[in-house]
Amino acid sequence: MDFRELDRQAMKVTADVVSQIRPDQLRLPTPCADWTLHGLLRHLVSEDLAFAAATTAGTDPSDVDWNAGWLGADPVADYQRAAAGYLAAFEPDSVLDRQMRINVFGVFPGSVAVTMHFIDTVVHGWDVAKTIGVPYAPDEQLCAAALKVMRRFPSDRPTPAFDVIVEVPDDVSELDKLVAFVGRDPAWA
């Protein structure tokens, strides 16, 4: 399955949330343990830049700097530029078969890299929205697709990428199920 369209949708919803960040909110804590909103936004910028760079880099771990995203005077604009670069890099169909190193996780075809980015975007979009207190409403089918992929990952937690699964009732939204599966409390405030 080509996850690029789902990733584009997730990025649009996340960009809408990011566009609402005010400078005075950058020091707020987020649902991501150890990260302020500034740190989380820097992570998103770093990931977008690094995923884009990985499409043309080699597979050696030193080929891409996964922490290269810096926020200047306008962090929202920095995010928008990095996101646009990511989308452009993953536009060609040929990128889906290209082997690329994704941070410490290993070497994957671009089709898997897009899927990883998609999940990261959906979850971190929720993190940003919760932090600044604005609605976050990605399509339920988009969230269900992300959850389906996540359920393939081991549930043995915590790991460097995911915290212990949070138990939620069966009748919560697909988004709440997803964020709970990656270790976030859907009721975080």
Predicted region positions:
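Glycine-rich loop at the start of a catalytic domain that most often binds anionic cofactors/ligands
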Residues: 43-44
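Extended, alpha-helix-rich binding/interface surfaces that flank or overlap catalytic cores
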Residues: 40
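Structured surface interface patches that mediate subunit assembly and partner/cofactor docking
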Residues: 1-5, 10-16, 20-33, 50-189
